[in-house]
Amino acid sequence: MKTFSDRWRQLDWDDIRLRINGKTAADVERALNASQLPRDDMMALLSPAASGYLEQLAQRAQRLTRQRFGNTVSFYVPLYLSNLCANDCTYCGFSMSNRIKRKTLDEADIARESAAIREMGFEHLLLVTGEHQAKVGMDYFRRHLPALREQFSSLQMEVQPLAETEYAELKQLGLDGVMVYQETYHEARLVICLLINHHA
């Protein structure tokens, strides 16, 4: 099975850039009126030619969002489980070179914080950690996710890159969603941003 990285590396970015920049107002209008958005139409909506259509883009986005999710707004609260990190990224407050006090919540801390969040009426929780497999990795998640799952109707997590089997295990532990943020997919820029990266 091809990974996301494999597929990403196969893309011809010079060709994509030329195609995006070559789109016209007519291409944008066609894309705005299309019922489906194939890649070529999406390129039109991302192109400089689309800059004069921001209001129409916003209206289309709102229609599609309401069609998909209805008229609901959900709020979540982040629970910072740990700011330990084994990486040194130029853009991140958790970066290992930052001289800050490090804290990893234990069972009592988590119980206290989650009770306070529930008292405020929130039912959707986003768990946040730095990237430190040894101290805030799967063993830590196995210990603490089941108790949190019992208290919240939605449990999501921003987490370091894991193996596919570990993502499946997080789901079994009660996680509804996982977010892994990649600040850039441009490999030359990534090297500049990630001074030390244990997942590269």
Where are these regions (language model features)?
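Short low-complexity stretches enriched in small and charged residues
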Residues: 31-32, 45-47, 82-84, 134-137, ...
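Short charge-dense sequence patches
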Residues: 1-16, 42, 59-68, 89-100, ...
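A broad, structure-centric signal for solvent-exposed, well-ordered loop/edge residues
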Residues: 44, 52, 82, 86-88, ...
